[in-house]
Amino acid sequence: MHLIIYTAALIAALLQVATWDFVQRAGEPPDFGGQIASLSLAYEPTHVPFHGKDPSVEAVDHDLSLIAEIAKKVRIYSVEGTTAEVPKLAQKYNLSVTLGLWLDDERDAAGNLIQEAHDRNRQEFEKALIIARENWNVRELMVGNEIMLRARMEYPDIVDPETGATQLSPEARIRLDDLLGYLREARRSITKPVSTSEGWSEWAAIPELGAEVDFITTHNLPFWEQIRADNAMAYAFEKYDVLRRIYPGKRILIGEFGWPSQGYNRMAAVPNPLKQAQVVREFLIEAERRGVDYNIVEAFDQPWKTFEGSNAGPYWGIYNSDRQPKFKLVGPVQKDRPWMPVGGVLIGSFITVWSLSRRRPTFGHAISYAIAANAIGAGVMSAAVYPFDYYLNVGLWVMWVIGFILMLPLSIITLAKVHEISEVLLGHQPIRLLSPDKLAPALPDPAPLVSIHVPAYKEQPDMYKATLDSMAALDYPRFEVLAIVNNTTEEHYWKPIEEHCKQLGDRFKFVFLPKVEGFKAGALNMALKDMDPEAAVIAVVDADYQVHKDWLKDLVPWFEDSEVAIIQAPQDHRDGHETLLKTIMNAEYAGFFDIGMVQRNEDNAIIAHGTMLMVRRSAFDLAGGWATDTIVEDTELGLRLMAEGWHAHYTRTRYGWGVLPDTFLAFKTQRHRWAYGAMQIIRKHWRKMLPSSTMLTPQQKYHFVTGWSYWFSDAVGCAISFMNLVWVPLIILAELAFPAVSLTVPVLTAVL
């Protein structure tokens, strides 16, 4: 048996290792043996709310030393704070500088000047001019960054309905005029080339802007255009060629090109470390071949962009935020994390061996469970590594912690389900399951008297009478039927039942309880006084169930085993074909009774259901009868009897058929009652599940705890749905983002 378990664990572990090897396989993009023409360097803006930590001069100097190892030039976007020291510090490393100055929108939508923004822009502008004049290594000046791109996104172009021609909106026009004013002033003030940086589409749409710069600086970023990584380089140069045709003879600088290593997909554009290395290397080689001037964005990852609601934005660096290279420019590219598959295999193997060592698994059962356990192990490792791959803001930390915690019970529930299904479908044939071909003990003479209790609350009389008629046809010598109508004062409900019992004979007793407390259990307890004192077995059937004539004849003999207190037959339904909803509900019920109950029965841990249930009278009396402090008195009684050492048996053979809820609302109400009842049982009997308790076997505890966890998961699912709704405004207003992919492996395992 252990050989089967270890073999399955080994095979599943090898499959996991192979999967990790495929996912983390080394890529071999083309080598780039030269130096990068230019790299962007940007720090957290100090004047923006929630930002503001300026790097030290020593930190900037260290960054420039790293850039100098692989690049000839550095591009900066502002002269704010310590960034203003970059040109001077870069001279030590013989780095040229593309000097940028940042311009905020200084007018509102109506064109009114925002004085604070204007003053800040003027200060930035004049400071940049001074730096450009005083530093020999400043090669060019960038006045503003993507000003018109932002303006056109905020205020879309106006389309002429007749000609289809487009023109700038009045609001965007105001921003263009302000930008042109700064450009003209800069060109008059310094002798070095002046430009501004925009997306290629802005240069194509606004030739007026191109006329006011010494050279074109275009941002060609295929990722944001939703272009596949394989086509990124070709797309960038295609747009470059478009601008060459529009501006013949004018120098064109690809001011930004790059690819993120992490983040959400943008349709076909997929960020990951291997694709980043591939895209950047291919571009560098082609740019060198063509003699194109370019700048790669970024030198370093920018974690502060997570506070701006950007998912891929922080991950464009050649170096990560710890200043470690994410890939080299030559040689294979691989994420070297051998501890991830090792951790996943250890988790998967431990779960497999620990869980199956108490069973008698077949190879099919063992391998299916081992594969699921290894999938969970891989998922746990993927989720655990998330903080190492992503820069987490407060919202990401909150959601990652919550997601990781919730992933653990999901994993447990998933493994329990896989164990249940694979053991029943692929495991050994059940030993304890009662079946027609299993020889039952001989029925003694006289046969035990069975008292069948049929409680009803405002049930339709015709349906109730059909149930009683089916019992009248039972092929069993000694039984009685108690037709219990409780809390139903309307005569049209109970009077027909009373009359029908008289017609069916002395075996049928009508018990009318107009006012009862204590839920269904209260009615059943009050009806006990009407039960025949000689009754040896109590059977309970819902008022909508029509029973098979052999029900008692086939199952009562098993009570000859003096240790047996419960015999349970499955619930089934005679109207499952009527609607699609009922077909789905019936299939869901059947899955539990044909799989879950069969497996639980092997460990003497079935759930007692309040229909098609038979209980030994003496055990019932010793247990104290039906408990009135829960709405699921049947399940609670079953748990008490098992805790007292009694045995329960189950048969998969159908002996009764009821009716399904007619509407989804009725189905939901039923499930709410079951879930609420389960919580009542947990509150009452949780101490029996503690390791120190000896009232239940470990296997019984396992089944009850995992069974209850399904109800917990449903409740948590509702809570998470509510949390998702609450989280939406936090994402929008507070920019608290949500980690996604790393937590989905256990979810996918659960679905599959």
Label each region the model flagged.
Residues F32, T46, G52, N265-Q276, ...:
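Aromatic-rich peripheral "rim/lid" segments of glycoside hydrolase catalytic domains that contact
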Residues S349-P444, H703-W727, I731-F738:
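N-terminal membrane-anchoring/stem segments of glycan-assembly enzymes
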Residues E85-K192:
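Substrate-binding cleft of extracellular glycoside hydrolase catalytic domains
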Residues L468-R478:
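Short, acidic, metal-binding catalytic loop of nucleotide-sugar glycosyltransferases
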Residues P448-S451, E480, V485, E636:
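Cell-envelope/extracellular polymer assembly enzymes that use nucleotide-activated donors
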Residues P477, V485-I497, P514-E517:
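A conserved acidic beta->alpha catalytic loop
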Residues Y93, L99, R139, N145, ...:
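Aromatic- and acid-rich polysaccharide-binding/catalytic face
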Residues E499-A536, K549-I631, E636, M642-A643, ...:
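Long helical/loop segments within the catalytic core of UDP-sugar-dependent glycosyltransferases
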